[in-house]
Amino acid sequence: PIANSINQLNLINKLNMKKKFNRGIAVHFDTGMSRLGLDESETNQFLINKIKYNSIKIDLVMSHLACGDQAKHSMNTKQLDKFRIIRKHFPNSKASLANSAGIFINKKYHFDLVRPGIALYGGSPFLNSKINFHHVVNLKAKVIQIRKIKKNDTVGYGATFKAKKNMYIGTIAVGYADGFNRKFSNNM
């Protein structure tokens, strides 16, 4: 599990003291993304009172780059500096800062392990990438029916599409029954 707040660390600490939880965890520190992790106040509170949490085995300390897709963005250096300070408090724990974009910025962001997200699936974390990423999967489906509909006819679950004019529509052989989320209806 990954602890993202003091409340979660307190809960894990209580469970450990009652011998109900006894595995290593990761602690996520927010160094600038303002999304997940202990914020600056919680980080300071945790580090000052670290001895209180000595029942917790911390296998990994981590953070997430907010601007990794912009290699020269000053935020990357700010986050790296903050993360290095935090990491010094956990010399026996592995550390991770680099997300997909961070992998390609510079090795100094790698620490002990990297966390490829979109890159794992062949997606580029960069808007204008010179790196030749290859998607690992493609969705292909055959058109199994073509039909003519009239203006104001509706189509699909929830009648989410309404024809603005007489038109032809095609139905492909993939959908809800195949695990394809309905939110993609009329959005392909």
Predicted features and spans:
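Functionally critical, mid-to-C-terminal surface segments that flank or help form catalytic/ligand
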Residues: 140-187
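Catalytic beta/alpha-barrel core
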Residues: 1-9
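Active-site loop/helix belt of alpha/beta enzymes
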Residues: 9-24, 29-142, 149-150
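Proteins with a high burden of low-complexity, intrinsically disordered sequence enriched in S/T/G/P/A and R
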Residues: 7, 17, 185-187
